[in-house]
Amino acid sequence: MLPINNNFSLPQNSFYNTISGTYADYFSAWDKWEKQALPGEERDEAVSRLKECLINNSDELRLDRLNLSSLPDNLPAQITLLNVSYNQLTNLPELPVTLKKLYSASNKLSELPVLPPALESLQVQHNELENLPALPDSLLTMNISYNEIVSLPSLPQALKNLRATRNFLTELPAFSEGNNPVVREYFFDRNQISHIPESILNLRNECSIHISDNPLSSHALPALQRLTSSPDYHGPRIYFSMSDGQQNTLHRPLADAVTAWFPENKQSDVSQIWHAFEHEEHANTFSAFLDRLSDTVSARNTSGFREQVAAWLEKLSASAELRQQSFAVAADATESCEDRVALTWNNLRKTLLVHQASEGLFDNDTGALLSLGREMFRLEILEDIARDKVRTLHFVDEIEVYLAFQTMLAEKLQLSTAVKEMRFYGVSGVTANDLRTAEAMVRSREENEFTDWFSLWGPWHAVLKRTEADRWAQAEEQKYEMLENEYPQRVADRLKASGLSGDADAEREAGAQVMRETEQQIYRQLTDEVLALRLPENGSQLHHS
């Protein structure tokens, strides 16, 4: 390898004169470009990297995060990877024909040059592109999300992954599959697409198309649902949402959104309190969430719903930690349909109860804590069931599936945190048989797994630390003694039995398993002891609802 001086002020000897002569045109153009730097640009660093790349004949050139407003016209001809992301570029020069990977995300590009014929990866998300040039047949992956693109050129047959979220696309491209074995995943979420072309059915059933948050026509959704529900359907899996993607991005002040849930005689005091939280993270989206929550079927039809929300908001105003958690949970809820808001409300109520349990609300009411734990366990199992159901559907809005199991089983499984109504159950794909099977599975797993689950539940541990400090300390001492005396040998025995001694990944996995088994044994014993003391009149309460 040729010796390199970082500032590339080449010594005057015959060896370096030869190099300098070979690259004279490049060096001269780059030096001139460097002298034209605008304030804040790191063109000196860019030129250093350019010269190093050229002299070393490197196939990668990385000029990202240098605040560059332009690039020199003559890039090294041999490069296969160019990274110029996170700059201030408004255009790109002619690209080397050898280029296979182009990274130019988070710039200000309004157009792209002709793309090299061997290009395999194009990453130009977060720019100002309005259209794309012809795409080379070699292209495998492309990310054009967060641009202003209205239509797409023909997609190469080789393209496996396309991300075109948050553009202005009004239609999907034509899909031609034939016998092509490529497994594709294409994302067109949050565009302006109203119709789905029949050519989408040409894709294989291993492919996935994401079209959530688009204004799909009233005819497109039921037609696709009928088609994809057919036993003969062998097309791609299509992810959609009941949202039209047109949510209002204007948020009224947080205090105004909060006070709307309270009686008029309380609004002045509430407004004064909540004004102090206007600038907390996610405050704007939380405001929008509250407004959308007021328009759900539960808010319109459920008696006492407004009072329930007001009481919850009072608790948030008194706890910065709970408020921070709740703002974060609600952050994305305004970007989807009404049922997404309802599901978020379920999650917010769970967050409140778990927070209260951890903070001591149930320290003197073990029976109530058990009931809460049982509900959290049931919801966890329902999420597993919903996740499995999603995998079986070809045309699916995941939010509707998750909410359907919670809403439709809320009464039978005594789910106090679940809304009792949802708007779009009909598109969830969840059948009456699914619900019967889910209820039976929850009860079976609860009978067999709840005791162990509860003994490891964080809020229960918080209660034990506060109210059974001596017993908790003894359990922790027992755990650390095991770690010191038994843990290494148990891990070694497990690795030996599986023939994986010396495998670092297997050792980590075996260690985690041994630790969990140990904690399960110790905390289960502690749990049984404490519950026997606190609930002597109902020793079976842990095992039955």
UniProtKB/Swiss-Prot annotation:
Ranges of residues in domain NEL: 253-545
Record PTM: Autoubiquitinated (in vitro). Ubiquitinated in the presence of host E1 ubiquitin-activating enzyme, E2 ubiquitin-conjugating enzyme and ubiquitin.
Effect upon mutating D339A: Abolishes E3 ubiquitin ligase activity
GO biological process entries: proteasome-mediated ubiquitin-dependent protein catabolic process; protein autoubiquitination; protein K27-linked ubiquitination; protein K48-linked ubiquitination; symbiont-mediated suppression of host defenses; symbiont-mediated suppression of host inflammatory response; symbiont-mediated suppression of host innate immune response; symbiont-mediated suppression of host NF-kappaB cascade
Primary location: secreted
Catalytic residues as annotated in Swiss-Prot or TrEMBL: C337
UniProt GO cellular component terms: extracellular region; host cell cytosol; host cell nucleus
Effect the entry attributes to changing R190A: Decreased ability to ubiquitinate host GBP1
Phenotype on disruption: In murine lung infection model, mutants cause severe inflammatory responses, with increased pro-inflammatory cytokine production levels. Colonization is greatly reduced.
First and last residues of every LRR repeat: 57-77, 78-99, 100-117, 118-139, 140-157, 158-179, 182-203, 205-228
One of the record's GO molecular function terms: identical protein binding
Listed result of changing F187A: Abolishes proteasomal degradation of host proteins
Impact noted for substituting L216D: Slightly reduced autoinhibition in absence of substrate
Impact reported for C337A: Abolishes E3 ubiquitin ligase activity and proteasomal degradation of host proteins
Alphabetic keyword roster: Host cytoplasm, Host nucleus, Leucine-rich repeat, Plasmid, Repeat, Secreted, Transferase, Ubl conjugation, Ubl conjugation pathway, Virulence
UniProt-annotated location(s): Secreted; Host cytoplasm; Host nucleus
Entry function: Effector E3 ubiquitin ligase that interferes with host's ubiquitination pathway and modulates the acute inflammatory responses, thus facilitating bacterial colonization within the host cell. Interacts with IKBKG (NEMO) and TNIP1 (ABIN-1), a ubiquitin-binding adapter protein, which results in TNIP1-dependent 'Lys-27'-linked polyubiquitination of IKBKG. Consequently, polyubiquitinated IKBKG undergoes proteasome-dependent degradation, which perturbs NF-kappa-B activation during bacterial infection. Mediates polyubiquitination of host U2AF1, leading to its proteasomal degradation.
Family membership noted in the UniProt record: Belongs to the LRR-containing bacterial E3 ligase family.
Protein name: E3 ubiquitin-protein ligase ipaH9.8
